From Swiss-Prot:
Catalytic activity: [E2 ubiquitin-conjugating enzyme]-S-ubiquitinyl-L-cysteine + [acceptor protein]-L-lysine = [E2 ubiquitin-conjugating enzyme]-L-cysteine + [acceptor protein]-N(6)-ubiquitinyl-L-lysine
Activity control: In the autoinhibited state the side chain of Phe-462 inserts into a hydrophobic groove in RING-0, occluding the ubiquitin acceptor site Cys-430, whereas the REP repressor element binds RING-1 and blocks its E2-binding site. Activation of PRKN requires 2 steps: (1) phosphorylation at Ser-65 by PINK1 and (2) binding to phosphorylated ubiquitin, leading to unlock repression of the catalytic Cys-430 by the RING-0 region via an allosteric mechanism and converting PRKN to its fully-active form.
Binding site residues for Zn(2+) 5: 417, 420, 435, 440
Entry binding sites for Zn(2+) 3: 331, 336, 351, 359
Name recorded for this polypeptide: E3 ubiquitin-protein ligase parkin
Coiled coil regions in record: none
Biased composition (Polar residues): 80-96
Species whose genome carries this gene: Mus musculus (Mouse)
Keyword Secreted: no
Functional description taken from the UniProt entry: Functions within a multiprotein E3 ubiquitin ligase complex, catalyzing the covalent attachment of ubiquitin moieties onto substrate proteins. Substrates include SYT11 and VDAC1. Other substrates are BCL2, CCNE1, GPR37, RHOT1/MIRO1, MFN1, MFN2, STUB1, SNCAIP, SEPTIN5, TOMM20, USP30, ZNF746, MIRO1 and AIMP2. Mediates monoubiquitination as well as 'Lys-6', 'Lys-11', 'Lys-48'-linked and 'Lys-63'-linked polyubiquitination of substrates depending on the context.
Region annotated Necessary for PINK1-dependent localization to mitochondria, chain positions: 77-236
Region (SYT11 binding 1): 203-237
Amino acid sequence: MIVFVRFNSSYGFPVEVDSDTSILQLKEVVAKRQGVPADQLRVIFAGKELPNHLTVQNCDLEQQSIVHIVQRPRRRSHETNASGGDEPQSTSEGSIWESRSLTRVDLSSHTLPVDSVGLAVILDTDSKRDSEAARGPVKPTYNSFFIYCKGPCHKVQPGKLRVQCGTCKQATLTLAQGPSCWDDVLIPNRMSGECQSPDCPGTRAEFFFKCGAHPTSDKDTSVALNLITSNRRSIPCIACTDVRSPVLVFQCNHRHVICLDCFHLYCVTRLNDRQFVHDAQLGYSLPCVAGCPNSLIKELHHFRILGEEQYTRYQQYGAEECVLQMGGVLCPRPGCGAGLLPEQGQRKVTCEGGNGLGCGFVFCRDCKEAYHEGDCDSLLEPSGATSQAYRVDKRAAEQARWEEASKETIKKTTKPCPRCNVPIEKNGGCMHMKCPQPQCKLEWCWNCGCEWNRACMGDHWFDV
């Protein structure tokens, strides 16, 4: 297999190794190539200095993995031992390294708190798990992290957790201790260590993720989907009841589990109905599929599961909702829909075309029709004829209007919502109306125009 070595954080070169090649042997190969003493080399991978006795396989190095090798003078014995460096180590010390390696970190237990209801069985707190841990650290047979790979995979994939120095941005930082929860990984400056690059005093740790499905370069990073985890305990999906893996775990009190296919369908359905929730802090998000309170998804990259086309719609709708929440309007011309932020009280709105986005349409902010003088209601009223020599019978003029019948029908079957003024058509049925706008949803009475109440229900629920 091939591993790529970056020497002193500069250039990189490939080295051919076997799975049973030791770290000491890797140092000797690099030392011979670079013309430096092997005992001055330190091998850094995934936030830890690799001890000499471990093999490539023990260190979880995979095909085309990138390791950093730095040349630094040997430090005092107690410092070297503490970092797992050049001094010989016992098997138990090697096991300690394995348990602290980023390649063995498992944060899935922190997706669910110990006091969660209904799905606490997914936690690794039972006696079986404890007994397995007592036998010593082993590489997980499941994926601990998941990411969305924007390319070349374009889908959810297993992820690899890595760390770099916050100062020089090189993956040469050795952690003082490994992360124990998602906050350690996601919140900046929570973890520290020591950068092994020459002349770099950096101590801040910056974590990042890479796609585990294909070889990656230093710059190929992905965002972690911290709600997605392997379904090791065979929890059925809340929607289809099938047992699938991986699954998404909502952050509600019950930690409801949903498979990724059902989550995709849930998102598309809500998107089609424009039923996403606009949160001032989080943005355009969705709660638990069961409607649990305080369960909005905080990491919006989870909606990448929608796929490119639907995700583009999601971004567009989110931007539109943001404009509306800010008191703006959307251009009503079909095919445009540009977001506009006119001055407060400004009734005449122009969809500016200078920025390449607007269409130039001038419309009324209140009724969303082409701009007009006077009240919006006057658009549906017959306009008075101006003084002229040729006179016609008023009654005949009213009966001869081609579009008047349609306007009269609109008057009779359409009324504005009392709260948001969106026109709503009544096509038979009772007087109980509900505004379809996601940000309004007012339930009101068609007959009296007020919010729906028991008096309306008793007096004219089914008035014709």
